[in-house]
């Protein structure tokens, strides 16, 4: 179970990091457009 939890956390970070980066770019673009 511990391995599965660590794997899940790794996947979560792998998804959240690029997602947060894209969100920041989107917010900057929206602000520039406005």
Curated annotation (Swiss-Prot):
Any one cellular-component term (Gene Ontology):
chloroplast thylakoid membrane
One GO-annotated biological process of the protein: photosynthesis, light reaction
Q: Which Pfam families match?
A: PsbM
Per UniProt, the keywords (alphabetical) are: Chloroplast, Membrane, Photosynthesis, Photosystem II, Plastid, Reaction center, Thylakoid, Transmembrane, Transmembrane helix
Task: List locations, semicolon-separated.
Answer: Plastid, Chloroplast thylakoid membrane
Q: How does it sit in the membrane?
A: Single-pass membrane protein
Question: What sections of the protein cross the membrane?
Answer: 5-25
Which parts of the chain are coiled coil? none
Organism's domain of life?
A: Eukaryota
The answer to whether the entry has keyword Membrane is yes
The entry sums up its family as follows: Belongs to the PsbM family.
Q: What does this protein do?
A: One of the components of the core complex of photosystem II (PSII). PSII is a light-driven water:plastoquinone oxidoreductase that uses light energy to abstract electrons from H(2)O, generating O(2) and a proton gradient subsequently used for ATP formation. It consists of a core antenna complex that captures photons, and an electron transfer chain that converts photonic excitation into a charge separation. This subunit is found at the monomer-monomer interface.
Query: Which PANTHER family would you find in this protein's record?
Result: PHOTOSYSTEM II REACTION CENTER PROTEIN M
Subunit (UniProt): PSII is composed of 1 copy each of membrane proteins PsbA, PsbB, PsbC, PsbD, PsbE, PsbF, PsbH, PsbI, PsbJ, PsbK, PsbL, PsbM, PsbT, PsbX, PsbY, PsbZ, Psb30/Ycf12, at least 3 peripheral proteins of the oxygen-evolving complex and a large number of cofactors. It forms dimeric complexes.
Which named protein is this? Photosystem II reaction center protein M
Q: Which organism is it from?
A: Tupiella akineta (Green alga)
């Amino acid at each position: 179970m511990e391995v599965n939890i660590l794997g899940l956390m790794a996947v979560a970070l792998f998804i959240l990091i690029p997602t947060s980066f894209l969100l920041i770019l989107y917010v900057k673009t929206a602000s520039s457009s406005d």
